[in-house]
């Protein structure tokens, strides 16, 4: 409707000002829109105008994100759907709807972060050994997310910015892979790297009813396991544990004279309650005197 204001003052001229005053909507006559999730291909916001008068014919006057007014080519409003193009990011947007007959209505729309994805070619647990070649975790994330890496124990394994893991010492390290981005929820994946001692080598000297077995001293190990048997497949072998890496010799007595024995050795590393075993040496045979 229109309001006319008239002013008269003494000998001054009469001034009339006519202005259109848009009525307010009733309290229950509102425009609403639900929050949405970010989509790199574009975002659709469904606007509910069912409670406003049919003759309101609301259109979008402007969209603001904080103090920034979005350019008109970054969105389109048609048939109750407000479509943002792919350049619109996560954030809170205030949409101003205008009508020729009613006062403007402001509606807040929140664009929430989307669920990102993160995959790796590497399994959740990787078993390797000292001397092994570096390998890549093969991580891939949703486009628009940045992948970063961190090692819990750089004395065991390091990881480069492109996800290449290098073995440094025996033990256990956890590689945390993180994918993050301004439009996505952060995703993390943990990969456990278990590094065992390297493969052992073994030699032995025979004597009267005994064998003196020697192997390579391994400072990356906690200790060693020595196996001896009368069968080549080591079925029924007796196992001896040497608990110090500094000891690299074991004499086994009370063996049968003129009997052939098969021996092999491996190193192990103790981490908490876990033992990491290196590969056994090649099986060697010796005939006791």
Feature annotation, model-predicted:
Residues 1-12, 16, 20-37, 41-81, ...:
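Extracytoplasmic soluble-region selector
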Residues 37-41, 131-133, 205-212, 244-249:
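Ser/Thr- and Asn-enriched, surface-exposed coil loops between beta-strands
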Residues 54-59, 217-237:
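Solvent-exposed loop/turn segments flanking beta-strands in beta-repeat/beta-sandwich domains
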Residues 61-63, 150-152, 227-231, 264-268:
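Predominantly extracellular/luminal cell-surface or secreted proteins
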Residues 196-220, 274-289:
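Pro/Thr/Ser/Gly-rich low-complexity, intrinsically disordered linker/stalk tracts
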Residues 215, 226-228, 252, 265-267, ...:
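Gram-positive cell-envelope targeting signals
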Residues 225-256:
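Recognizes extended acidic, P/S/T-rich segments that occur
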Residues 252-273:
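Beta-strand-rich modules
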